[in-house]
A protein has these predicted regions:
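Detector for C-terminal structural segments
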Residues: 43, 248, 353-384, 426-436, ...
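N-terminal lobe/hinge region of extracytoplasmic solute-binding protein
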Residues: 62-118, 237
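A bilobed periplasmic-binding-protein/Venus flytrap-type ligand-binding module shared by bacterial periplasmic
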Residues: 94-95, 256-260, 326-349, 353, ...
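Gly/Pro-rich hinge or "lid" segments in bacterial periplasmic/extracellular proteins
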Residues: 96-100, 173, 177-178, 196-197, ...
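Ligand-site clamp/hinge motif
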Residues: 226-236, 261-312, 444
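Structural transition elements
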Residues: 242, 367-407, 422-429
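Ligand/substrate-recognition segments at binding pockets and active sites
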Residues: 283, 406-480, 553
């Protein structure tokens, strides 16, 4: 893979030019262009660019790797959460809008948001009537129940995706083993379907943000008769506006209009392109070139352009760019189950050793995010500004790090391994900068790269693999599952979130006090009161030194002037909202 790094001097100069320009432009709040892509830089952050209902054409996405899965019940990449809504309608979703409006949860397959009862421990939803799959059969509440069962209670088959519903729904006695092992018609008793258009969820405790939780694709319907486990991804049946025409693993997916989709029971979707093509495993520089040449339209992964492209765009003051934030943190997880990181002093030594400015520069400089010191990003409600491991100018403190290495019984340092995703050059560059920082205090780091599509299912997200291979450090980016402190923190710091595969609590943190604070807080119906507690949880996590915050992620997109309805949605980590993108 080609290196995407440029010298720090060239990059910083380009960033300085761009920041000066963007301070003058202010963006296009109306989102209106002249039809030739003349909207200002950041126009899609503050508005909708080229709003249009024009139909037709083939919309082309490209990705630098294969996703973990297009199966809505077996994915945990944000871009698939975003994209899957085209063919899998969850009960709720986020409004396709910029700014604060984009963080609002709205009904999708459900007629309205949920009706809580039993103090918030029971939630009832009514499904829209007349919603049909691509084969013409009608969607029922039993299909939604089955979708939840297969995605949350069959982790040996579907290892990816959040585990909230498995954690918080009341379990059967004896324990429910999922639909592939439990062949009973009743299934999970805590999900009731009194009729074809009503579904009731019964939880172990009150859960104030349940509407947000159901915005993930695990609440999309899957008819039991059509499911064949791991092979379902090969012939997904659509409940959305588009359906799969073909899917070739590691090559491409092609979607066409679902002829049975009805705008009358779907107020969110427009069904604009004739066809949608997703090309997989395309080199990032090639993606950037294709976007600029008009040969493709969107980088579906949404991690931003390569550094060389970034420098060119910023130096030329290209207006077809969006520099967006979206509740996301770039960090390094420290594995508490791999020695010597089972000792908190050794973890703290790493915290002090890292030169975060060098890491930030390796990732692309300030335009890609400010240096971070907390787990909660600055745009998540409940964020509190603090720095537990403050160092001079954020460039590390070698003396303090060596002092802590001595305290943890490693005065001469030690060897460990750090993982990064091999299709993400910026992530590898950051790992390289960390490697250099740790070398200064005697910690020798080997960088091990793995494919993004298998990063959680086979490698970094498999505790046994990380322990067997003595992987002590793991590069990670995390965007909130929904824009609250709980939606950000729970799956990365709660002990119950640790899984055998598809694990996202990479540090394997299991602190009873932190677990209890999260559980107790989500039961509180007062949002302001919940927000206050999340800052306290953040501080306790940082005291454990299991996460090294690196940058508060910002993305630099190239916005194709050929697309319509371009809007950067913070709910999708600043990605363009894929629900209604069309072509001029």
């Amino acid at each position: 893979m080609k290196s995407r790094s440029r010298s720090a001097a060239v990059l910083v100069a380009a960033i300085s030019i761009a920041l000066g320009a963007s301070a003058c432009s202010g963006g296009d709040k109306t989102g209106e262009g002249d039809g030739k892509g003349s909207a200002a830089a950041n126009a899609a952050v503050t508005g909708v660019v080229n709003a249009s209902d024009k139909k037709g054409g083939t919309l082309v996405y490209e990705a630098s790797d294969t996703p973990d899965s297009f199966d809505p019940g077996n994915t945990y990449y944000g871009f698939v959460f975003n994209f899957s809504r085209l063919y899998a309608r969850p009960l709720t979703t986020f409004a396709p809008a910029p700014g604060a409006e984009g963080n609002k949860v709205v009904p999708d397959l459900a007629e309205s948001l949920g009706v809580p009862s039993d103090g918030g421990a029971t939630w009832t939803y009514k499904l829209r009537k007349g919603v049909k799959y691509s084969d013409g059969t009608e969607v029922t509440s039993k299909d939604v129940k089955y979708g939840v069962e297969r995605s949350n209670f069959a982790r040996d088959v579907h290892s990816n995706g959040p585990s909230y519903l498995a954690q918080y729904l009341k379990d059967n006695e004896p324990k429910y083993e999922g639909p592939y092992k439990d062949k009973s018609d009743e299934g999970l008793k805590s999900i009731e379907t009194p009729d074809d258009h009503t579904i009731v969820f019964k939880l172990k405790q009150p859960f104030a943000e349940f509407d947000y939780l159901l915005a993930n694709p695990q609440s999309a319907p899957v008819p039991k008769a059509k499911d064949d486990g791991a092979d379902y991804v090969k012939h997904i049946i659509s409940s959305g506006s588009y359906m799969f025409e073909s899917y070739e693993q590691d090559k491409q997916a092609v979607l066409v209009r679902n002829p049975n989709w009805d705008a009358g029971n779907d107020p969110l979707r427009k069904q604009l392109p004739d066809k949608i093509v997703v090309k997989l495993k395309v080199n990032q520089e090639t993606i950037d070139s294709n976007l600029k040449a008009g040969n493709s339209h969107i980088d579906i992964v949404g991690n931003g352009v390569a550094q060389q492209t970034q420098s060119e765009l910023l130096s030329s003051k290209d207006p077809n760019t969006d520099n967006a934030q979206g509740g996301r943190l770039v960090y390094m997880a420290i594995n508490t189950k791999v020695a010597p990181f089972d000792k908190v002093e050794c973890r703290k030594a790493v915290q002090y050793a890292v030169d975060k400015v060098s890491v930030q520069t390796a990732f692309g400089g300030p335009v890609r995010g400010a240096v971070a010191s907390t787990v909660l990003p600055t745009d998540i409600p409940g964020h509190v500004d603090f720095d537990t491991y403050k160092t001079p100018e954020n460039k590390g403190d070698e003396a303090k790090s060596k002092e802590l290495l001595t305290a943890c019984g490693q005065p001469n340092g030690f060897e460990t391994t750090i993982t990064a995703r091999n299709d993400r050059a910026g992530e590898v560059d950051m790992a390289t900068a960390i490697q250099a920082s740790l070398k200064k205090v005697g910690i020798t780091v080997k960088i091990q790269q793995y494919p993004a599509g298998k990063y959680f299912s086979d490698y970094a997200g498999v505790p046994k693999f990380t322990e067997d291979n003595k992987i002590g450090l793991m590069m990670m980016q995390w965007g909130a599952d929904w824009p609250t402190g709980f939606g950000f923190l729970q799956q990365v710091v709660h002990g119950d979130a640790i899984g055998k595969t598809g694990n996202t609590n990479l540090s394997q943190l299991n602190n009873p006090e932190i677990n209890k604070m999260l559980n107790d807080n989500i039961a509180n119906t007062d949002p302001a009161a919940r927000e206050k507690v999340y800052g306290d949880i953040d501080k306790k996590v940082m005291d454990e030194a299991v996460i090294v915050p690196l940058t508060y992620f910002k993305v630099l997109h190239y916005r194709s002037p050929k697309i319509t309805n371009a809007v950067s949605n913070p709910a999708w980590s600043g990605q363009y909202d894929y629900l209604n993108v069309g072509l001029k």
